[in-house]
Structure formats: structure tokens, C-alpha cells
Amino acid sequence: MRGSSLILLSLQFVSAWAAAAPRLKVLCMHGYSQNGAVLRDRSGGFRKPFKKSRFEMSYPDGLFGCTKDGEDQEEADADLKRRAWWRGHSGQQTYVGWDESHAAMCELWERERFDGVIGFSQGAAAAAMLCAELKPRFGIFVAGFVPNDRAAAAALLSGVDASVPTLHVIGTADSLVTPERSMALADLFDGRTVLTHPGGHMIPSAAHVRGQVASFVEAALLECQQPEAECTVRL
């Protein structure tokens, strides 16, 4: 009877400890011409593994508006629906505004102390550049790529922490960010896991994708068993 009571008390203690454990924070960066709310809505199936765990997801908006034909940048910046992390379209060699976005995200990271980062398309490239400096516990890049901007690419290539566990989700039919471009980003990380799907430029939500995302995050967090002071990012 005494043994059963001790087991019950131990289980109650573990449950209380788990309930009191701090929530893990994840920074989620949207793609070009999206915003945080759009990413949240379009990634509902993909992020189901996070809903079942103690994760707190953050969806900031990009600093800049995306210009349409005949629209100037000031008008675009006033549009809160179509945002970007830097000005310019795919293929341009100079990213105008990335320095401002980088500073803003570093400030947000220092304040919130994120544990992981998720990015889609332009947001994945931005998240990868942040990984090079901020060293999160894990990174998930959907349709990511190495930046075309030479200075940004050089900073990523020279500063990347190859040991950060990363998951690279690649659509084999993606014509906007080709699988080859996404693999070039994946090859920068020694701790990479590559997950392909038959779709195009999208965030997949199939059950097997969710299962692999959950397995990746669990394994990545298990790798980080040092004291929190050493594990948590410090700028």
C-alpha cells in the first residue's frame, strides 16, 4: 500500500511539474505578399503537432508592403495585408530593407527568447539568416532558399551554425522555389532532415507530414539537454 502511495505521489509531482513548465516559443515568418494572420490560417494542418504540445506560436508581420502596378512604396507600406521582409521580387540581387527587418527580428528575439523558428518561402530564407546568428533549438524551413542578395548570402554562408537541427520541407512540383534551391539551403546544415511532398509552392498538411514534423521537433528538443542558460539563445 505504501509503495502504491509513493507511485501516486510521484505521478502527481510529474504532472504538476509538466503543467508548470514554461511554454516553448516559436517564431513563425510568413512568405512574400502574406502576413502573420495569413500564415497562421494557411498552416493550420501543418502546425497541428504544436497545438498538442506546450508551444506558443508568434506570427509577426513583415515591415514592408508589396507594391502593385502603379503603386508607390508609401502606399504599399500602408497595406497591412500584403507584407514582406524586404523589398524586391524573386530574382533581384539586392534586398532593400533586410537590415531593418533583421534588426527588428533580433530585438523581438531578445525580448521573447524563442526556442525555434518556422519560415515559409521568403520567410524561410529570412529565418535561415536569423538561424545563422541566433542559434535556436530548431528551425523549420518550408520552400526555403539561399538569398540572391550577395551580402545576405555571404553572411548566411559564413555565419551559419551547421549544428542547428533543421527540417526542410520541399515540394517536388514547386516552380517558384525549385527543389534545387531548397536543397542548397538544406546542405548548409549538418543536422538537416529533408521532407519532400508532391505539391508545389505551399505548406503541406497531410497526416504523414504532420507526423514527421512532430517527430523532428521532439528529436530536436531532446538534443538540447544542457542547462537552460546554455541552451537558450543569448545575443
Residue ranges and their predicted role:
Residues 148, 172-177, 201-202:
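Acidic catalytic loop of the alpha/beta-hydrolase fold
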Residues 38, 175-181, 204:
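Conserved alpha/beta-hydrolase "acid-adjacent" motif
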Residues 168-170:
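Short beta-strand/loop motif that positions the catalytic acidic residue
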Residues 62-63, 139-148, 199:
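Active-site nucleophile loop of the alpha/beta-hydrolase fold
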Residues 118-123, 127:
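Gly/Ala-rich beta-loop-alpha elbow adjacent to hydrolase catalytic centers
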Residues 23-116:
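Serine-hydrolase catalytic machinery in alpha/beta-hydrolase-like enzymes
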Residues 41-44, 153-154, 178-187:
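Short alpha-helix in the alpha/beta-hydrolase fold that links the catalytic acid
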Residues 205-219:
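Post-His helix in hydrolase/transferase enzymes
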